[in-house]
Amino acid sequence: MDSSIAHYWAQADGVIRATAWVLLAMSVASWFLILLKLWAWLRMRRASRALDQFWAARSMDEAIAALRPADTESIFVPLAASAQQAAARRLDESSMAARIDRSELITRALRQRINEAAAKLESGQTLLASVGATAPFVGLFGTVWGIYHALIGIAASGTIAIDKVAGPVGEALLMTAFGLVVAVPAVLGYNAFTRVNRKLLAELDGFAHDLHAYLTLGARPGDES
């Protein structure tokens, strides 16, 4: 008896094949997203290492210009630019907005950019979580459907023997294995990027704190006068 995957595919009906194609699409999508986010993370690391150049500059304009080539993912530069714009903003003295303290304006600008950066970092992770959660059940559906049709075929043949049962059932279990192969990388990728994003956001929050201190007090926390 030929128990190869090719034989199983040749014997599979439309439902099994459709299930396999769905799992394949889920796998391709999750791997594409994992590689894309990995590439983006590597570029963000490059930007974070360039923060020393930012603080070594003599002015905010020079600092932003020095950081821009390294910040290809636009995570740190928009934060600094928005804070600078908020600090330099001139308001009509008669307006209600003019009563807001400049420190609060800078804080609001920084918070808005941090929220945007968080949304950017977390983009796509819902897909990874969904693939990791549903792929095993999609594979299990294919297995149940395959076993059902295998048992129907065995009943139609009128003979019950271990070799007649083990072959079709074993082939049907391939769908469960396929579902796990799809789910495991998605779950690992989701967990890894969740941890990485937490560290990046903490670093971004620290950068925002330093920016706020510089623009309101004229110095970074810890700098000697």
Task: Describe the function of each predicted region.
Residues 13, 31, 63, 80, ...:
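Residue-level signature of catalytic and energy-coupling elements of molecular machines
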Residues 172-188:
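Hydrophobic alpha-helical transmembrane segments of polytopic membrane proteins
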Residues 17-33, 129-136, 182-187:
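Alpha-helical transmembrane segments of integral membrane proteins
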Residues 12-65, 69:
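Transmembrane alpha-helix/interfacial motif
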Residues 6-19, 121-128:
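Membrane-interface helix-boundary signature
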Residues 1-14, 155, 159-161:
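Short, strongly hydrophobic alpha-helical membrane anchors
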Residues 46-138, 147-161, 188-225:
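Predominantly long cytosolic amphipathic alpha-helical stalk/bundle segments
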